[in-house]
Amino acid sequence: MKMCEFLQDRSQVDATTTFLSQHGFYPHSITPKNWDLAHILPDITEGPLLDMGCCESYILGNAKIIGPKFGIDMRLPGYTIPGVTLLQGDLMDTRLPPKYFQTLTCISVIEHGVDFGRFAAECVRLLRPGGKLYVSFDYWNPKITGTMNLYGLAWNILCRSDVEGLIQICEKAGMMLTEEVDWSIKDAVINEAFYAPRGSGVAYTFGLLTFVAK
């Protein structure tokens, strides 16, 4: 799988859901999010892991690694995950040890009011050299405009210029993409007939970027 690309169509949702089940991972209850998980979970390497925005984390329970696992969110899930330390706090100011983590994941979070500059700076502070950051997000191009909220937070579906800005900020902070971005998009997979928030009137897809710390 490419690690810097976009969800193209429903067939990819079906294929990645099957992939997770066949490889011993439990799939997400929102099936299109299995596209994110199927890219990230097999690629995670041994070492400390932090899921940034872990309220409904399918990463932490699925990650088959030896090493400490942490999650941070302003709102914690109402359950515990065996072997995982869950922290209530700001993912842009985690107060966790510097250069400690091998892997950071941030799944469908940065479109909800996250400051890209503060986020990138904190990720660089947390990652070991050679450690990876996986970021997924809601996406459509051209830009979907208008004021939207979801989960009580601002909801900014990213467009190409937004993503290019995020990449530039991350690179300036000290992380590089693991490969060139495949900017092609096909279908607005997430729509009112398939998992878009009820009444939102928007249609979009998912994107994934993978960075490595210098």
Regions found by a protein language model. Give the residues of each.
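Short catalytic/ligand-binding loop motif for oxyanion handling, primarily in non-cytosolic enzymes
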Residues: 37, 56-61, 78-80, 95, ...
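Receiver (REC) domain switch-region micro-motif
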Residues: 49, 104, 109
